[in-house]
Each structure stands twice: as C-alpha cells, then as structure tokens.
C-alpha cells in the first residue's frame, strides 16, 4: 500500500515550539549590543516626527525591584510602539545620583567621621557602581535605549545645569530665604521635601491643656460671653498630640465664625467650641453648665497665661481651626507648624524654635520645675512636659491615640516640624507685581496637561492648590551646592549673584561640585570676600531630577529630546515627587509644565493585594522571573495588567501568563511553518484572486491592527494583549487556521488555493509580529529573523504593516459573522454525535443546516466549500425558517491522505485509498476552491 504522507505539504519551521527564553534572551541582548540595534534604529528614524518620553530617573542605590521593572517595561512598550507608528522616539535612560541614602551608605561603610570631601568622592564612586548594576538588569528586560550614554544627575554637565536652573529661578523672583517650619528628620539631620514624607500610624500622647485667662482680661472675657462677671478662673482648653511643642507656644487659635461656649465646671469655667464641648467634658469626667456663648472673633486678643512659663500669650483667630477633633482651640507654635507659622505671621508672633538640628532642646530653653529640657530630645521631653502640666494642675486629660503621622521615607522614623532658615521656592511669589503667582501658573499648567488615567488630574490639581512653599535647601554633603555668597551682616546674597552663579557653573562643568566646596571665595569676590560667607547647603535631590527638563532635555542630551516632552511616566507616588518638582521648576523657569502628558501606574502587590516586603516573604524579584521564565513573560504580564490600579503578581498569575504566552507562540509557529516555502516577492497573489475566507481573515487582521494601534496610542496595553490573545485563540486557532489546514496540507503546493492561504498568512504574520514587538520584544525579534531570514534585520526597523486594501470589507465581516454563528451551532451538533459514540471525528459526519434569511444566503453562497468551514465531509444548507442542525454519520470510506469520508474513495483503481480530490490535487489539475 502506498504511503502518501510525503505528498502532504506539512508545516516546517526553524521556530521552536519551546521558547527557552531564559537561555535565548541573553543571546538576543548580546546580538542587539553587537549590531548596535538602538543606534541603527536612530539612523533609520532620522527625520521622522519626534516623540519624547523623558525618563524619570530611578535612584542609584540597590538592585532593581519589580516596580522598577514595570516602569521600564511600560516605557519601552511606548517607545517601541511609537517607533512602529512612524516616530523618531529616542529613549535616554537616567539615574538620580545625589542625596542622603547614598551618603548614609558611605557612612555605614566608612563611618561618620570621614571629611566632607571624602564623602563626596566615595559617594560618586558608589553611585557609579550602582548605576552599572541596575543598568545590566534593565538591559536584560529588553529595554532599548542609549545605555552607553545615559544621563546621571552627578555628571558634571548636570550638576552645572542644576546650578544654572537655580539661577534662572532666582532671576525670575521665585527663590527666597526664610525662617519657616519645615519637615525635619532627626536621623537625617536635614530638612525634607514634601515628597520625602510618608504617613504611617503612630502612637502618641493626646492631651487637653488649660490656659488660664489673664486676670486683667477676665472682665473683657465675661463681656464677650454676655456676662457681667466671672465666678472664678476661666481657661481656654487646647488639645494636642505634640506636648514637646508647648515650650514654643505663642498663642491659642480659635475660628472667627465658630460658636464657643463658656462652661462652668468644678475645675473652673472652660472655653470649648460648641460642637466638641459635650465630648470634651465626657473626656474630662466633668459636668458643666453653659454660662454664655459667643463667636470666636469676640475672643480675639484676649490674654492667656502660658501653662508653665512665666509669660502671656494671646487668643488669635484663624480659619485653619476645625471641629474634627479636640476642643476647637488650637495650640499655636509658629516654629513647629505651617498653619501656626502662617497665622503667626499675620499676627506678628515670634518664631521661637528651642529645638536644635539634632532634635534636642537647646541650652537656652527655660527649665521646667520638674527638671531641665535642655539637651533632651523632643521625644524625651514629652513625659517631662506632661509631668510639669500635672504638677501645675493644667492637664485635664492625658491618653494615648493611634493616628496617621508624617515619617521620613528613608528612615521610617517620625519627623517633626521645625523652623530653620532655609531656601524656598515660593508658591505665592511673582516674577513682578503685574505677574501671576507661581501657584496660579502651576494650576494653569496642570489644566493644560493630558493625564493617563484621567483621575491623575484631580490629584495633582489638589496638591497644587494646597502645597506649601518648596524647601529646596538641605544640610548635607553629597548634593549640588547652593552656590551663594551671603553677606555676614545682612544675610543677603551678593548683588552679583546671577553673574557669580554662571562663573561657578563653568567651574562645576569642568570639575564637578567639588569645584564649589574647594573654592576660595576670594577667587570670585576679591577684596569683598571678607564680608561674605560661602554657603554649605546643598539642593534637595528632587531639584536634581525636577530640573532634568533644563539640564538634560535642553542640555546634555538636547539632540535626543524635544521640549516640552510628550510624556512623563512614573508610579502614582510621583504626583507628589518628580511630576510635581518638574512642574514647579518648569513653571518657574519657563512658565509652563515641561511635559504635555503624564502617565501614572500603580504599585505592584502580591496575589492577595498585600504590599511586597522581605519580612512577609512575598517579594517577587524581576531578576528571578527573567532567569526562571524569561523577560518576555514579565513584559507580557506588565502589558496585560491594567496599570491604572494596583498591579497584582504571584507565581500563580505568572503561570497563567506563561500559558497565554504558549498559545501565542504556538500560533506564531503555525504561521511561520506554513509560509516557510512562500516568497512574497514571487508567490503573492493579487487580492482579487484570494479565496473569500482569506479576504475575511485579512479584514479581521485589519480590525485587530487598527484596534491595537488605537490602544497603543491611548497607552491601554492590557486591551492590546486581550485583543492579541482573542485573535490567536478565537479568530485564528479556533476558526481560520483550523479551517485552513486541509487546504494548506492537501492542495498542490503552488496552487491558487494554497497560495491564497499563504498570501493571507504572510500578511497576518507581518502584522501580528509588529503588534507583538512592543510587548514580547525578544519573541518578536525571533519571529522576524525566521520570517525574513535576514540576521542583520530587525522588526524594530519597520513601521506598522501596510495591509492591502480590500473592497466591501464591512459586508464581508458581517457575512462571516453569520457563518461563524452557524459554525458554533454545527460544532454543538457534532459534539452531541461524538458523545453518543456515533462518530469519532467531525469528518465522519454529514451536516444539514436549516436556516433562513441572511444566514441562509451567507451559507449557501459558499456552495460545496461550506463543508471545509464546518470541517465535515459533507455539508448542505437548507432554506428553512425552522432553524436546526442535523448531523448524521457517513458510511463511506475514509481517504488515507485527507481523512475526508467520501463516496469516491477508491474510484481511481491506481490509488484505491484516495478520494477524488486528492487524486486531482496530486496527479490532475487540482481541486478548485472558491470560498474556503
């Protein structure tokens, strides 16, 4: 008996079924570096419209974590998709290199006693080492970029650029020096920016303290409450969770419009806001009678006695007072709170700060009767202050509460508000009297920015409305200096500061920040040097990264950027970090945001929605995923997850991603295997010669490509992945490719029927591999090499595939949608026959499908080809308004070659095991297919 297996056009490809990604991907990385893929893409894209995604620099300290990986992969997806969209989309990665975490690492390694210049030298070397470690991991993820020439905020050009940016902001009138309360970390020994503060729960004392009304003001107080006199002493009661700030108290604030009651109790008359009075009395275990009431404005300027210092303080009015908790009267220490400072400024209160840089009370702090405060930390002072209040009978209640409290983001320790002389970028400052405030300019810039997702707008708007002035000075060594010479008597910057800044910048450009720290003032000031002191403060690291639009985009890497950038992309925490610092510096320098759009992604959590931490043992490191499963799996997971919320990852989730990847890979393998003997230059058929189902597949591919391109442009990558996976499983694997196998394998190799199928498959593969390229970068490159056979080529040298035009595409899609509905009905009927044991496969059945209307017309138009669509040996459409599918077993012989069960099997005596169409395909003119 003849063996006809060799007569089939069986699929053949060098593209392996198993991806073996952990092994193959590093080889691709090496190949890309060897052939300078990124540089070649730049050459090919030269002259195209520019798209600028400006990289927010990760901090150069420690290995990258899964959040870093998500961030870089999202950026790479955008850069790749924009390149395929016909843009020139360079990507210059950057690193944030100055700041306290690195300085702390140096102190850990070398001790705290090392001199400042040595700290800077060691910090620079440490940061460079960290950059190389992180760079290697980012490259392993398949991220394309100018890795040989990244921007580093510690590059001399960047350091000089930051100094020039500061000069510009000073020039515009937004920079000022002031004694104000700022976030202060006792462990850092430095001021913190808003972005360096995070809120955690803290257990604190919550105390109610009585401030006695001064005897000279009791009559005035009685009158305010509509009384002729007071029966005894009266007290204004405050509530606070920071007893240590009471030595710095300068006033008690009330709300001018709220109603306050004077309540007579056994401990004297207490002034409490009406809304909180009942709860307060209950807290004190007291009963009382309301003697009188008045609004807060009637109490303005009443004198009180400080609870333990021999001085008087006044009641003042402020709209910051609320009825959320406490007593409705607020202890006011201008040195230890922003609201306190602002209201104190209005009333001309002194800014009395008794706390030093180390968080300890200074030597001149007045002693308490129970002991000295001087030399004690603020936390040590708390119990002592409570003891003093108790001794003076001024403590009405002392309890512990759990509440949200600001912590240093590095040390995870509670911070304090502490007034120090710092440099600020003023939100209410103006360039000149006729100009708008920086806050107004920033709010307008937010309004002009596009947000992905849209909710980011409200978040940044809210922050701009309420944020305080930006404290940009730090008391550290490893940072860009604030290069001002301050007059020894007035404290004012030198009148030639703008000119001096440029001279310093030129020196820093050559030698780095050490040029300032080692500078002799006389070199720039001459004889004036004796009258000035050189500042030692450094700039907030958020100023470093926040001004990259100036010193990178329009400085060191201007050729690779356009200003403003099209997009900034970072995690949701950067609304209060890089997005905000960039916005403020951009508005201060240029009067606009340095970006047109902001994209925000959520944080990565484990499968149960918990934050990842080493202590919980739920950390998934990107390096482990790449080494075990492959970077393309991590990239596919990133793209398939809706980043607008939290991104959930677990071993189980990654397993599902692997399964999805395998389906895609198997589809790609089928496509490649069936075009391996197809040369588009010589074998491509004109579209009017294609079979109808092939034209339909092309229409589906165009729908896919148009939809994916739109989703790429909207940065909705999870929708792209959904569409690609649906196309693979339903349109291709579950329909088109299943139907196509018979035609591909059994018709003559060069027949119109087979070439039509291959023409469609070639276009599908060309489009599909490009749509995958931004996401599964390594796999797409592997497919491209097999598809083109050109080792020196790359899918990233291309643009989206130009699919051939197709007339009547809408009608075709509608018609085949009906056919697919009918096919689903047929499949159910065949499954019932299979379950009943009447057939083994669909090819052993004959099908009658009864239907009417458009469905019948669609099915009948396929004629004898209908059986190929249903993968049956015999199918007929019957016009009948009573829809039904009748499937019956066939009794004929099965063709050994095509497996169809046909009456004409054996009709040709020379080939007794073949059906008529196989004989024709092998030895005759070949069967004619019209539709499928």
Swiss-Prot record:
Gene Ontology terms for molecular function: aminoacyl-tRNA deacylase activity; ATP binding; isoleucine-tRNA ligase activity; tRNA binding; zinc ion binding
Domain note: IleRS has two distinct active sites: one for aminoacylation and one for editing. The misactivated valine is translocated from the active site to the editing site, which sterically excludes the correctly activated isoleucine. The single editing site contains two valyl binding pockets, one specific for each substrate (Val-AMP or Val-tRNA(Ile)).
E.C. no: 6.1.1.5
Family that this chain belongs to: Belongs to the class-I aminoacyl-tRNA synthetase family. IleS type 1 subfamily.
Functional summary from the UniProt entry: Catalyzes the attachment of isoleucine to tRNA(Ile). As IleRS can inadvertently accommodate and process structurally similar amino acids such as valine, to avoid such errors it has two additional distinct tRNA(Ile)-dependent editing activities. One activity is designated as 'pretransfer' editing and involves the hydrolysis of activated Val-AMP. The other activity is designated 'posttransfer' editing and involves deacylation of mischarged Val-tRNA(Ile).
One Pfam family from the record: zf-FPG_IleRS
NCBIfam families: ileS
Signal peptide: none
Subcellular location: Cytoplasm
Cofactor remark: Binds 1 zinc ion per subunit.
Residue span of motif 'HIGH' region: 58-68
Stated name of the protein: Isoleucine--tRNA ligase
Residue positions binding ATP: 614
Locus of motif 'KMSKS' region: 611-615
Residues binding L-isoleucyl-5'-AMP, per UniProt: 570
Complex formation: Monomer.
InterPro entries: aa-tRNA-synth_I_CS (IPR001412), aa-tRNA-synth_Ia (IPR002300), Anticodon_Ile_BEm (IPR033708), Ile-tRNA-ligase (IPR002301), Ile-tRNA-ligase_type1 (IPR023585), Ile-tRNA_ligase (IPR050081), M/V/L/I-tRNA-synth_anticd-bd (IPR013155), Rossmann-like_a/b/a_fold (IPR014729)
A GO BP annotation: isoleucyl-tRNA aminoacylation
CC cofactor: Zn(2+)
Classification via Gene3D superfamilies: 1.10.730.20, HUPs, Ile-tRNA synthetase CP2 domain-like, Valyl/Leucyl/Isoleucyl-tRNA synthetase, editing domain
């Amino acid at each position: 008996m003849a063996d006809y297996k060799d007569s089939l056009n069986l699929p053949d490809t060098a593209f392996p079924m198993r991806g073996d990604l952990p092994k193959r991907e590093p080889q691709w990385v090496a190949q890309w570096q060897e052939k300078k893929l990124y540089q070649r893409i730049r050459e090919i894209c030269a002259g195209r419209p520019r798209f600028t995604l400006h990289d927010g620099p990760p901090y150069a300290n420690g290995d990258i974590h899964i959040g870093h990986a998500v961030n870089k992969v999202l950026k790479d997806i955008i850069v790749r998709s924009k390149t395929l969209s016909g843009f020139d989309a360079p990507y210059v990665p950057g690193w944030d290199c100055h700041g306290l975490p690195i300085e702390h690492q140096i102190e850990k390694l070398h001790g705290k006693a090392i001199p400042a210049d040595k700290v800077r030298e060691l910090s620079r070397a440490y940061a460079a080492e960290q950059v190389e470690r992180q760079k290697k991991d980012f490259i392993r993820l398949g991220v394309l970029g100018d890795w040989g020439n990244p921007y580093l905020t510690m590059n001399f050009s960047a350091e000089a650029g930051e100094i020039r940016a500061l000069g510009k902001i000073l020039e515009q009138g937004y920079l000022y020096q002031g004694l104000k309360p700022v976030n202060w970390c006792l462990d850092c020994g430095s001021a913190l920016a808003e972005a360096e503060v995070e809120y955690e729960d803290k257990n604190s004392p919550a105390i109610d303290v009585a401030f006695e009304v001064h005897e000279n003001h009791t009559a005035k107080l009685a009158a305010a409450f509509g009384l002729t006199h007071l029966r005894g002493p009266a007290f204004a009661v405050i509530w606070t969770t920071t007893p240590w700030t009471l030595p710095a108290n300068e006033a008690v604030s009330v709300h001018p419009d709220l109603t306050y009651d004077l309540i007579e109790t056994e401990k004297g008359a207490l002034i409490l806001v009406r809304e909180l009075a009942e709860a307060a009395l209950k807290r004190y275990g007291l009963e009382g009678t309301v003697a009188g009431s008045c609004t807060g404005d009637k109490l303005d300027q009443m004198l009180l006695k400080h609870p333990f210092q021999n001085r008087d303080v006044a009641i003042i009015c402020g709209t910051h007072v609320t009825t959320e908790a406490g007593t409705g009267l607020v202890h006011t220490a201008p040195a230890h709170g922003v609201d306190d400072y602002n209201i104190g400024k209005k009333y001309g209160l002194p800014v009395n700060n008794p706390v030093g840089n180390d968080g300890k009370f200074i030597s001149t702090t007045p002693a308490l009767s129970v002991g000295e405060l001087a030399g004690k930390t603020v936390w040590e002072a708390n119990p002592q202050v409570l003891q003093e209040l108790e001794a003076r009978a001024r403590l009405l209640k002392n309890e512990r509460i759990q509440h949200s409290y600001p912590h240093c983001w590095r040390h995870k320790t509670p911070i304090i508000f502490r007034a120090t002389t710092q440099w600020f970028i003023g939100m209410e400052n103006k360039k000149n009297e006729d100009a708008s405030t920086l806050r107004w300019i920033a709010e307008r810039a937010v309004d002009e920015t596009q947000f992905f997702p849209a909710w980011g707008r409200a978040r940044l708007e809210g922050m701009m409305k309420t944020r305080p002035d930006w404290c940009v000075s730090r008391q550290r060594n490893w940072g860009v200096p604030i290069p001002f010479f301050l007059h020894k008597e007035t404290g004012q910057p030198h009148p030639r500061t703008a000119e001096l800044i440029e001279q310093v910048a030129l020196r820093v450009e050559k030698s780095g920040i050490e040029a300032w720290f080692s500078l002799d003032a006389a070199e720039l000031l001459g004889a004036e040097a004796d009258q000035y002191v050189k500042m030692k403060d450094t700039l907030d690291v958020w100023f470093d990264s926040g001004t990259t639009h100036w010193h990178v985009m329009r400085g060191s890497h201007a050729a690779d950027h356009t200003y403003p950038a099209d997009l900034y992309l970072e995690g949701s925490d950067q609304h209060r970090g890089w997005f905000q610092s960039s916005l403020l510096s951009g508005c201060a320098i240029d009067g606009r945001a340095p970006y047109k759009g902001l994209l925000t992604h959520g944080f990565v959590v484990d499968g149960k929605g918990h934050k990842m931490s080493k202590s919980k043992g739920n950390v998934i490191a990107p390096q482990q995923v790449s080494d075990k499963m492959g970077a393309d799996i991590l990239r596919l997971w990133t793209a398939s997850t809706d980043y607008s919320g939290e991104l959930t990852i677990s071993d189980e989730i990654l397993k599902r991603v692997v399964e999805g990847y395998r389906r895609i890979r198997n589809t790609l393998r089928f496509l490649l295997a069936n075009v391996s003997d197809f040369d588009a230059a010589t074998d491509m058929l004109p579209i009017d010669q294609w079979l109808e189902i092939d034209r339909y597949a092309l229409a589906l591919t165009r729908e896919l490509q148009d939809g994916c391109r739109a989703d790429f442009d909207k940065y909705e990558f999870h929708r792209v992945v959904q569409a690609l996976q649906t196309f693979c499983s339903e349109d291709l694997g579950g329909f088109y490719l299943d139907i196509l196998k018979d035609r591909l394998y059994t018709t003559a190799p060069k027949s119109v029927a087979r070439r039509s199928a291959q023409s469609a498959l070639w276009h599908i593969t060309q489009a599909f591999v490009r749509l995958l390229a931004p996401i599964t970068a390594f796999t797409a490159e592997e497919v491209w090499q097999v598809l083109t056979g050109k080792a020196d080529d790359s899918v990233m040298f291309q643009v989206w595939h130009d699919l051939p035009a197709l007339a009547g595409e809408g009608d075709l899609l509608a018609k085949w949608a009906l056919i697919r509905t009918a096919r689903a009905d047929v499949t159910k009927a065949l499954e019932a026959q299979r379950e009943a044991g009447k057939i083994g496969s669909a090819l052993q059945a004959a099908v009658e499908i009864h239907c009417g209307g458009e469905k019948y017309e669609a099915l009948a138009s396929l004629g004898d080809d209908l059986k190929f669509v249903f993968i049956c040996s015999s199918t007929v459409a019957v016009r009948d308004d009573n829809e039904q599918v009748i499937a019956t077993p066939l009794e004929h012989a099965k063709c050994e070659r095509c497996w169809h069960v046909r009456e004409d099997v054996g009709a040709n005596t020379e080939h007794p095991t073949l059906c008529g169409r196989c004989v024709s395909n092998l030895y005759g003119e070949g069967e004619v297919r019209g539709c499928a």
